[in-house]
């Protein structure tokens, strides 16, 4: 959406000596909106490891499932600019925060084609169940880590 600040939300998990991406999605505002927040009508769409969007996009309303944006552009297969750079930057920054296991990162690409970190979410990284298991292939590992920390 050209009227809103659209952001890439990555959720990363720090394992012992590496950082992995749990989920990645593009958050987009709707026509005329300046923000991409789902709570005010925005939508989100999964980003595959290749950096391409995977339809559909979802909104906050349970019936809010979209194959295309308000301008008629189909989401499926659209390439997110500088996606690999965004992933690399999130992983690199996460390694500097050794006591934080899961972080939600919000990035955008500015009009100069530069990756910009908007914020990181330490307390509530966001859970986007509609695009698949929130903890992905690391579910068992993360749950075991939580169980061990309770002892």
For the regions a protein language model found, what residue spans apply to each?
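C-terminal active-site "lid" helix and adjoining low-complexity regulatory extension at the edge
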Residues: 65-91, 95-100, 109-151
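Acidic, metal/cofactor-coordinating or nucleic-acid-engaging core segments within structured domains
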Residues: 59, 63
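Short, well-structured alpha-helical interface segments that form or flank functional binding sites
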Residues: 2-5, 85, 102
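Phosphate-binding site of ATP-dependent enzymes
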Residues: 1-57
């Amino acid at each position: 959406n050209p009227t809103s600040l659209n952001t890439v939300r990555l959720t990363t998990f720090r394992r012992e000596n590496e950082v992995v991406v749990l989920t990645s999605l593009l958050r987009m505002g709707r026509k005329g909106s300046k923000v991409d927040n789902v709570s005010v009508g925005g939508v989100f769409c999964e980003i595959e490891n290749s950096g391409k969007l995977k339809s559909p996009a979802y909104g906050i309303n349970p019936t809010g499932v979209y194959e295309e944006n308000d301008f008629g552009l189909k989401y499926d297969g659209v390439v997110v600019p500088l996606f690999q750079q965004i992933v690399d930057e999130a992983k690199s920054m996460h390694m500097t925060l050794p006591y934080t296991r899961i972080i939600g990162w919000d990035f955008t690409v500015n009009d100069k084609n530069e990756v910009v970190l908007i914020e990181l979410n330490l307390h509530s990284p966001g859970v986007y169940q509609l695009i698949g298991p929130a903890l992905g292939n690391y579910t068992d590992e993360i749950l075991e880590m939580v169980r061990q920390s309770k002892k």
